[in-house]
Regions:
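A sequence-level detector for short glycine-anchored, His/Arg-bearing signature motifs
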Residues: 290-295
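N-terminal extension/subdomain marker
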Residues: 5, 12-285
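Nuclease-adjacent, charged terminal/linker segments that flank catalytic cores
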Residues: 1-7
């Protein structure tokens, strides 16, 4: 993978998102890239809520995972969505530009949770639905993770002298402390905010990798706080299996970070808290964990 290959792929991607009048919209670029996000299990479905790009805060879409505890917010880098954009606009060796756009997503989340946008965003604005959701105590109680996903048709590079090579940019997670009410009780919780950059390098890798573009990597020491002792159970030419005991708190933390990337659809359906039985099990775990194993 080199810069010329990425520039060619970018041109093909944007041409595919161009309408009959020669116009490239943010939403058409987003819709054309959703299959790649499903392929890497970053999202569960191509069906998302589209928000016209004229709305505030550059949010062009949002979705929830099947279990209902993860909100995904989609932003598009408007500066990058132009076939004629200059190299200095689409080739980045620093992630400051992307960080600024991702933080605008966090700004929208914070203001919505605090209901500061109720007067600013009209009810007729498609973004108002999400804004009102985030301002609801019921919804805040339900959501544990918010992913801010920035789609940019730019190319991330590492500069070494005059030579530029493709690179992936990563962004640190953070915790957002929120206050809400449940059953007349004032509560606080921390929502995990994750930032994801989907750029040309990422999309190109998906297109050529045949499903292996973004393998899931887990640091057990970071996730579980220590190394994990295992016992080899079976060994064949191309396969090994191990037995181990994993702490429940670590598994919870792992699912919180990776969610649907860990699970096949049948398991995701089992964990769907919109189903009454699953919702009651979740309530038992939260409010009376000592009863859960017996149940």
């Amino acid at each position: 993978m080199n810069i010329d290959e990425l520039l060619k792929y970018r041109k093909e991607l944007l041409e595919g998102a161009t309408d009959e009048d020669g116009y490239i919209s943010q939403t058409s670029v987003l819709e054309n890239t959703l299959p790649s996000l499903v392929e890497t299990k970053l999202i569960e479905s191509e069906i998302i809520n589209i928000v016209p790009p004229s709305s505030a805060y550059s949010v062009v879409g949002f979705s929830e995972n099947e279990a209902g505890e993860r909100l995904q917010l989609y932003l598009v880098d408007l500066d990058s969505v132009a076939l004629s954009a200059a190299d200095e606009v689409i080739i980045h060796s620093r992630k400051d530009h992307h960080s600024s756009l991702l933080k605008s997503g966090l700004d929208f989340i914070k203001k919505s949770v605090k209901r500061h946008l109720n007067d600013e965003i009209q009810d007729s604005d498609p973004l108002a639905v999400l804004c009102h959701k985030l301002g609801s105590s019921v919804y805040v109680d339900q959501i544990d993770v918010i992913e801010v996903i920035l789609l940019s048709t730019s190319i991330s590079v590492e500069s070494r002298g005059k030579e530029k090579t493709p690179k992936r940019f990563f962004f640190d997670d953070e915790e957002l402390k929120v206050s809400y009410a449940r059953n007349r009780e004032n509560l606080t919780k921390e929502i995990l905010i994750q930032y994801k950059l989907i750029d040309i390098g990422y999309l190109y890798q998906v297109s050529v990798s045949q499903g292996n573009a973004d393998p899931l990597k887990v640091s057990f020491e970071e996730t579980f706080g220590s190394h994990i002792e295992v016992l080899k159970a079976a060994e064949q030419k191309h396969f090994e299996s191990y037995l181990c005991v994993l702490p429940a708190a670590g598994l919870c933390n792992l699912y919180r970070k990776e969610s649907s990337r860990l699970l096949e659809k049948n398991v995701r359906s089992f964990l769907n808290f919109k189903v009454e039985a699953n919702r009651e099990m979740r309530n038992t775990i939260r409010t009376a964990p000592e009863k859960f194993i017996a149940y």
